[in-house]
Amino acid sequence: YYCDGKWSDAIDYSTKSTDSFSVMYVGDPQIGASVGQDSNTKEYHAMNDAYNWQGTLNSALSAHTDISFILSAGDQINQTKVTKEEDKLEQQIEYAGFLYPSQLRSTPIATTIGNHDSKSVNYQNHFNTPNAAVKAENTEGATTAGTDYYFRYGNTLFVSIDTNNYNCATHENVIKEAVENNKDAKWRVLMFHQDIYGSGYDHSDTDGMVLRTQLTPIIDNYDFDAVLQGHDHTYSRTYQISTDGKDHTDYTKAPSTSATDDFNAYLNDNICYNLESNADNAHKVIDPEGTVYFEANSATGSKYYQLIGTQQDYIAARSQSWRPTYSVIDITDVTLTVRTYDAATNEELVADGGIATAYTIVKQADKTSLVSAIEEAQKKLDEAKKSGLYTDASIAEAQALIDAAQTIADNAEATTKDVASAAAGLADVESKLVKIDNGNKDDDKNDDVKDDDKDVVAGYAKEGTGMAIWFTLAGVAFIGLTAVLVSDRKRKQQ
């Protein structure tokens, strides 16, 4: 880069695989949010939070060197108001702190708009958002900061929506466009800031719930596998959630106090979901219905919230460790796994009650053709066994091929490549069969040569090459005679 009359050092960047890849997921870096914890200036706290942010990135990217890019679920900065010039300056200082870490010069980052980002154009001045909404129906209600966007990486569609915009019809229009343009994406991941299924004290029972009734059916209808949230500065993961299929059109912001009948009615009205899975300590689901929702704690520790007093029925795991955390999402052809780590130790976070935070969704590869091929191969092998024409060793070798293919068919996490390879291997089953050569069995059912004749031929072969020489000489003589006849015919034609 050329800046202030000088060239910077060269920055190395290498692209990562798009077949199987890893993504880092963080919540609320919120540079500058530690302000108010002591008497230092805003600039001091922005510097302090930026230092911790760099520490998290350094720790995570050193431990997980295969990270393709970073996803940040909103609130990159803390300064919300921009009514004064000093407010605008403070925002710029905080954005400078957010973008300061050297790791961000070689690792892409995709952000979403948090409530602290939403009231200033400074957000969109700092981030390039691919496929950003421009149509009127895709931008209705957009905030000053920008609007929704999406991108494709490998087999996964990533969609980011600005939930500071409560016009969910706008979000549905963008989601519809993204899905229609990426129909072959194996995985769909949605990211937004407000946690509609979180467990933090400050938001999960207020503004997050307002959006819940409207977004849940959209998310369910477009078959998103995972939703990444921020906002509440706690960790949580839900069970698999789907919509209840009912209309929830009457919704308002939560009452100001929880000690009222109105609030209890509000809570009941916001039960707009079904739990598709609620098994305790279930860390892997195979071909599940519904969507899993994650809530990320602060990646910098600039601010934390308490967990809500009573754990909601949709929450499978939650934690407030009061330490910066980050998550890594590993995506393959058939699995999507999310693991959450302590940023200081890189050890996997353990949620309340000793619940592990690792969670895997398995989408099995299509094995229809493989299963049919196994059945056909086994049928042919069984017939070969009954015929008694083939050696035990070759039958065992063919059976081993079928058994190996069956192992792939039984493995929920077998990849599409594994399945194709197993199916191809079955094509060799018949070629593995070797006929018994004991002078008593036909080498070929369609061969009319009698066994006695075969013995004679075998005898010639054993005695030496005399017959072979005789056949060769006879062949030469025949070829010579043919040549003479052809030559004579040509002369007559002339």
Where do the language-model regions lie?
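Extended active-site neighborhood of metal-dependent phosphoesterases/phosphodiesterases
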Residues: 1-12, 84-184, 188, 214, ...
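N-terminal active-site segment of His-dependent metallophosphoesterases
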Residues: 2-83
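Active-site-proximal beta-strand elements of phosphoester/diester hydrolases
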Residues: 21-42, 155-165, 189-193, 292-298, ...
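Active-site neighborhood of phospho(di)ester-bond hydrolases with catalytic His/Asp-centered motifs
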Residues: 25-27, 69-75, 109-115, 162, ...
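Short acidic, glycine-rich surface-loop motifs adjacent to enzyme active sites
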Residues: 67, 72-80, 182-202
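Beta-rich interaction/scaffold domains
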Residues: 365-452, 469, 480, 484-487
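Extracellular Ser/Thr-rich, low-complexity/disordered mucin-like segments
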Residues: 450-471
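Cytoplasmic C-terminal tails of single-pass
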Residues: 491-494
